[in-house]
Amino acid sequence: MNMKGQETRGFQSEVKQLLHLMIHSLYSNKEIFLRELISNASDAADKLRFRALSNPELFEGDGELRVRLSFDKEKRTLTLSDNGIGMTRDEVIDNLGTIAKSGTKAFLESIGSDQAKDSQLIGQFGVGFYSAFIVADKVTVRTRAAGAPADTGVFWESAGEGDYTIADITKDERGTEITLHLREGEDEYLDDWRLRSVISKYSDHIALPVEIQVKNEEDGTVTWEKINKAQALWTRGKAEISDDEYKAFYKHIAHDFTDPLSWSHNRVEGKQEYTSLLYIPAQAPWDMWNRDHKHGLKLYVQRVFIMDEAEQFMPNYLRFVRGLIDSNDLPLNVSREILQDSRITQNLRSALTKRVLQMLEKLAKDDAEKYQQFWQQFGMALKEGPAEDGSNKETIAKLLRFASTHTDSSAQTVSLEDYVSRMAEGQEKIYYITADSYAAAKSSPHLELFRKKGIEVLLLSDRIDEWMMSYLTEFEGKAFQSVSKADDSLNKLADEENPEQQEAEKALEPFVERVKTLLGERVKDVRLTHRLTDTPAIVTTDADEMSTQMAKLFAAAGQQAPEVKYIFELNPDHGLVKRAAEVTDDTQFAQWVELLLDQALLAERGTLEDPNQFIRRMNQLLTA
């Protein structure tokens, strides 16, 4: 082979690390290398079809796209070739020598020593071409970009260690040819029956014909036999597609090793004509929280592939959904910019969003255990829904799950429908509390009255919860009420109109005024409360005041938040409050009041501005 411009280059450090991890973590599932390479060939064919829409000459007189497999037992090689889009020298360096995915370094650092878990994570990452090194100790690539001269072919070769060789060659046929020099012990991939079996398992559903070389034993002639159905799965009728085929197609488009939790395949005719195939994965992708990474569906127009990760068809809170849409109404030359402003896109987005929410409703109704698995993986994303998608807020609310005082468990298993069904007679509101952790929410003094009255409270401890609740105002006509807010309805619950209590409060009015004078502008108000049973004091905020958790959310985002002004509420029946009320010495009185306020602030915020002063004050009072 005549090679020019030959050079040896080092792999990007992340590639070396991924190759090492992959070879060791994925060996038990090594046959997926064939799925990955055929999937890449299918993508190359899709890209050529799309580009040829505006430049038919790229087909170079050969529009019959396919991928071919052949093997040589003597040389111990397996060769896979396609006549798709091919690559230039720069593209080979970018695609085979580096990983362009954002967040790659952080992803690789997250890989540990758990081999089973690592294999799932690496599978999610999308191993693609590099999977060849699971079974090969050397890989050779010959490629030429469609429409480019024959002498612009590229040779690439590597043993999957620290470097690779690249050179310019002459290649008459467009497309890519990958030759795997198999490791010792990998003879099964030199067997015709074994190759057919793997291809049928993983690649029956793709539209690209997969052909295997057949040699005539008598005269040595070579023919090619198609061994997959080569019909786009979503174009077939649902009745003729097996669950295994749906699962295999999911793994093809999502590059996932695990089966999906659920899927929905629909063909819509009428004002708009389209086919959608949507999947709910079983586990969250490694980059779901990476803001730089695009998430979206594969877009086809009249069965022609247009683009990957078309995010315009799904709201951000459903970014975990995988699948495709095949539209008959969009133009073949559609771009991301056109999609953004298209009424057709908006209508499709609305319809697909409703389809996914219906799928989740059905899953929650039919299989609570599977839905709980979904919630553990994607619940945090779904909690973004009420703020992002007001038109579907009620449906999303039904899908939310919470921890609750009813279950005495940190597991988020309680639905709002569950809560409403258990509401006490006469109860008009859905009570909840937000805190930094489940333990802090569960032990909050704000719950004392509700435990006493046997009223269930939802325990919210995810960072997003306070923000979510600012958009969730009611459910089935029942208003949401934070138990950490100062509210008249909570006073009624506490029977604060009891004549005996009113008499006791009157006697403590001078004490309350004394506390107000001492604290001044540091608090919004000082009040007596009967919401507490075991705690001497709490702080609350007015209904229109920013809550503690919302202020923390602003701070975490680096935004300036207004200072939270608390209402200081004292329990007149508690021994410490009674003791403080009896103190006549101003200095000692100030110590008691400051201690009670610090206790209340610590319970509410989890921190104090000056914890050392709090400790000194407490020690002084303990030894007084």
Curated annotation (Swiss-Prot):
Function as written in the Swiss-Prot or TrEMBL entry: Molecular chaperone. Has ATPase activity.
Domain of life: Bacteria
Gene: htpG
Molecular function terms, GO-annotated: ATP binding; ATP hydrolysis activity; ATP-dependent protein folding chaperone; unfolded protein binding
Annotated HAMAP family: HSP90
Any one GO CC term of the record: cytoplasm
SMART domains per record: HATPase_c (SM00387)
Keyword Methyltransferase: no
Name used for this protein in its record: Chaperone protein HtpG
Region of interest called C, as start-end residue ranges on this chain: 553-624
Residue span of region A: 1-336
Gene3D superfamilies, A to Z: 3.30.230.80, 3.40.50.11260, Heat shock protein 90, C-terminal domain (1.20.120.790), Histidine kinase-like ATPase, C-terminal domain (3.30.565.10)
Residue numbers spanned by region B: 337-552
InterPro entries linked: HATPase_C_sf, Heat_shock_protein_90_CS, HSP90_C, Hsp90_fam, Hsp90_N, Ribosomal_Su5_D2-typ_SF
Subunit-level organization: Homodimer.
Protein's organism: Yersinia pestis (strain Pestoides F)
Pfam families attached to this UniProt entry: HATPase_c_3 (PF13589), HSP90 (PF00183)
Keyword Nucleotide-binding included in the entry's annotation: yes
Keywords: ATP-binding, Chaperone, Cytoplasm, Nucleotide-binding, Stress response
Family classification: Belongs to the heat shock protein 90 family.
Organism phylogeny: Bacteria, Pseudomonadati, Pseudomonadota, Gammaproteobacteria, Enterobacterales
Location in the cell: Cytoplasm
